[in-house]
Amino acid sequence: MDSDHNHINGDLAHGFENMVCVRCNDGFSMQDQMVNSSGQVWHSECFVCAQCFEPFPDGIYFEYEGRKYCEHDFHVLFSPCCGKCNEFIVGRVIKAMNASWHPGCFCCEICNKQLADVGFLRNAGRALCRECNEREKAAGHGRYVCHKCHAMIDDGQHIKFRGDSFHPYHFKCKRCNNELTTASREVNGELYCLRCHDTMGIPICGACHRPIEERVIAALGKHWHVEHFVCSVCEKPFLGHRHYERKGLPYCEQHFHKLFGNLCFKCGDPCCGEVFQALQKTWCVKCFSCSFCDKKLDQKTKFYEFDMKPTCKRCYDRFPTELKKRISESLKDRDVENQRRSMSPGPK
């Protein structure tokens, strides 16, 4: 019997030697507690959540792409949140209106009828059942819907508050407590009647004509939102960079010089200080160079014209003879034409 017992223990020990923990890659001894799951083995202390590295409460875990997670971390990482109750969704998910929903939470926004199994219709950004949608269409097609009472708003009788449309009578002025009209104004997340607003001294943007609540730009005799003070050509915000004014309009440096000054033909930047003018173009001093070898040229350097660009003598001499001949003939023809035009009488 002792011989048989020793033989069994030896087989078990040999079996443990061939097993390795999935997490720590260490082996097992006869005294180690072991967890076996899906044909893989762990030390009991290694069998933990892949996210928080804590043991699984009540031994419950969820597996995703070969990794095991506790219930909390699995929901945080992979479960969608309901668009109504903001709780994690386990089981059936309804995807609609650019959000996910519990089946019991996806309801008509007017009558609260569940829509998961009967379908819905989109109306002014709302999910409605067929009956409510028909009533809304009959009440007034294409009009705003009040975000508070969900009723249609007569044309021209809505106000915007935090991005949504409302009947103005749902609100009172923050300062005088009078019921608001369509002439109300929103400032720092609060609504004011027009009279109270005008006494607050808040600047109005010269572009969008709305109050400026944060940083303000003062230019051209007006006030502007930072993002609304833009070049009148490219419409890019100046964002604190230098701007140029002409006849009451703002311009960025590039478009101001393009319209009213000189831009370097090569680099495209406005020319400042000394410039080179040749071939009906303007260059910065540092940019006036051979169009082939990029050798810097100056007023004393002899250059040739090729394709309306400057070419140094060394590069020009490398041109084929036939090409140089055609260039010379073309320049002569152009000079003759220019001379003829200069001698022609102007229109009477």
From Swiss-Prot:
GO biological process: cell-cell adhesion; cell-cell junction organization; mitochondrion organization; muscle cell cellular homeostasis; muscle organ development; positive regulation of integrin-mediated signaling pathway; positive regulation of locomotion; positive regulation of sarcomere organization
Residue ranges constituting the LIM zinc-binding domain according to the UniProt record: 21-73, 82-132, 146-196, 205-255, 264-315
Entry-linked PROSITE patterns: LIM_DOMAIN_1, LIM_DOMAIN_2
GO CC, one annotated term: basal plasma membrane
Keywords, alphabetical: Cell junction, LIM domain, Metal-binding, Nucleus, Repeat, Zinc
UniProt key word Methyltransferase: no
Protein role: Component of an integrin containing attachment complex, which is required for muscle development and maintenance. Probably function in adherens junction. Affects the structural integrity of the integrin containing muscle adherens junctions and contributes to the mechanosensory functions of touch neurons.
Subunit: Interacts with unc-98. Component of an integrin containing attachment complex, composed of at least pat-2, pat-3, pat-4, pat-6, unc-52, unc-97 and unc-112.
Protein name: LIM domain-containing protein unc-97
Origin species: Caenorhabditis elegans
